[in-house]
Swiss-Prot record:
Name of the featured protein: Putative F-box protein At1g26510
Coiled-coil annotated residue ranges, if any: none
Source organism (scientific name): Arabidopsis thaliana
Region (Disordered): 1-23
Xref: InterPro entries: F-box-assoc_dom_typ3, F-box-assoc_interact_dom, F-box-like_dom_sf
Pfam families: FBA_3
Domain of life: Eukaryota
Domain (F-box): residue spans on this chain: 24-71
């Protein structure tokens, strides 16, 4: 009968002890030094460190590391497209499905294909509304009871358990809390066969990484409301505009605290906005504040709110005119912002093969048009329904 050598066991224990001591030394390094070390590595090497230890992953995912690159704004573009493979076959034999493509731009004007995700989009996609939200490197895609979370850096995705209860999902939101290091998806549901002006009746939340089902949120203390805009996540809070009041005839800003799972009516809209016929429903994160761009003809008015102030006032209105570009572009929407404060504008639809976005610099009062050079081998984009969103994308989650 063989017995393990005590000498070998002692050597193994010494190796384990040495690795543990090295890990402790790394954990004790100042954050700025860790960030500088990772910045000197190639991106592929940085990605490998995500699986090395929780400490490395926390540093790489931190906002300090993400915003430490002194480069021009980097933009992530997510585009839902109907694709058809380009084989020499009759059209009836060519495959056709819905896919989600991610493109990322660098400091240059060109954009390269990044990753591709085949989503379970319905063949009746023009009749179904999908909700897309970004939070700290990940994107959630929601359609009724189906919820998907994807990593655009790797193309990987997970499908969440179906939302409980036989109800219709009115809207879904997505957020990240940096304190608890948790991602959460929240869904607002309503009774089947209800009217579009009825308030949402149940609110549920799912925490990524936890092996727990959807959890019901207690909303008995807040007024009835129905989500109307997209959601924007800032410092662990998800903000969205909702219809409130009698007959859902008013608009208010709601705030969902991710760590506490607490939802409340945060503030009402300015009196001036209540009298306008509002068409824009895209909230933005503008320099850490909630912003709402509204378009009147060729002029954009961007309202910015101070959510940290006592009165939660809408502090200022930014105005810029896109008339100089009306001849060279289609109808433009403000789709996002960069970490340097530039607004990103893009058409709602791309009916041909020309892809582009505009960057508006408020300080210089100037527009920059970026044409996106997109080439996908053996695939031709037949039609692109919309640009889903544009975001700062340095994260390697």
């Amino acid at each position: 009968m063989r017995t393990r050598s005590k000498k070998t066991k002692t050597v193994n224990n010494n190796n384990d002890l040495q690795k543990s001591e090295e890990k402790q030394k790394f954990d004790q390094l100042p954050l700025d030094l860790e960030i500088e070390m990772f910045r000197r590595l190639p991106l592929k090497s940085v990605a490998r460190f995500l699986t090395l230890s929780k400490s490395c992953a926390t540093t790489i995912r931190s906002p300090s590391f993400i915003t430490s690159f002194p480069s021009q704004p980097c933009t992530l573009i997510a585009s839902a497209a109907t694709i058809r493979t380009c084989h020499n076959l009759p059209s009836s034999f060519k495959s056709k499905d819905q896919r989600l493509y991610f493109f990322s731009s660098s400091s240059s004007s060109s954009t390269v294909f990044s990753t591709r995700l085949t989503c379970p989009l319905s063949p009746y996609d023009n009749l179904i509304e999908y909700y897309y939200h970004y939070a700290s490197g990940l994107i959630s895609i929601g359609c009724n009871r189906k919820q998907i979370v994807t990593n655009p850096s790797t193309g990987r995705f997970i499908t969440l358990p179906s939302v409980r209860r036989r109800r219709v999902v009115v809207k879904s939101f997505f957020g990240y809390d940096p304190v608890s290091d948790q991602y959460k998806v929240s869904c607002m549901t309503e009774r089947r066969h209800g009217l579009r002006q009825d308030p949402s009746s149940e609110h549920q939340v799912f925490t990524l990484g936890e092996k727990k089902p959807w959890k019901m949120i207690d909303c008995t203390s807040i007024p009835d409301h129905r989500p109307w805009s997209n959601g924007v996540c800032i410092d662990g809070f998800v903000y969205y505009v909702a219809k409130t009041g009698q007959g859902m005839s008013q608009l208010s800003l709601m705030r969902y605290a991710l760590r506490a799972d607490n939802l409340n009516l945060f503030t009402s809209l300015p009196e001036e906005l209540r009298t306008l016929k509002l068409s824009g429903d895209t909230l933005l994160n503008y320099e850490g504040n909630v912003a709402w761009p509204l378009q009147l003809h060729l002029i954009f008015n961007v309202w910015v709110m101070d959510q940290d102030g006592e009165k939660h006032e809408w502090l200022k209105k930014i105005t810029f005119n896109i008339e100089p570009w009306k001849s060279s572009s289609r109808y433009l929407d403000v789709r996002g912002t960069t970490h340097t404060g530039e607004f990103i504008l893009a058409p709602s639809h791309y009916p041909d093969d020309e892809f582009y976005v505009f960057h508006y610099n408020l300080g210089k009062n100037s527009f920059t048009k970026k044409k996106l050079q997109v080439r996908i081998y053996n695939v031709r984009i037949v039609s692109t329904s919309s640009i889903i969103g544009l975001y700062l994308s340095f994260s390697l989650l």
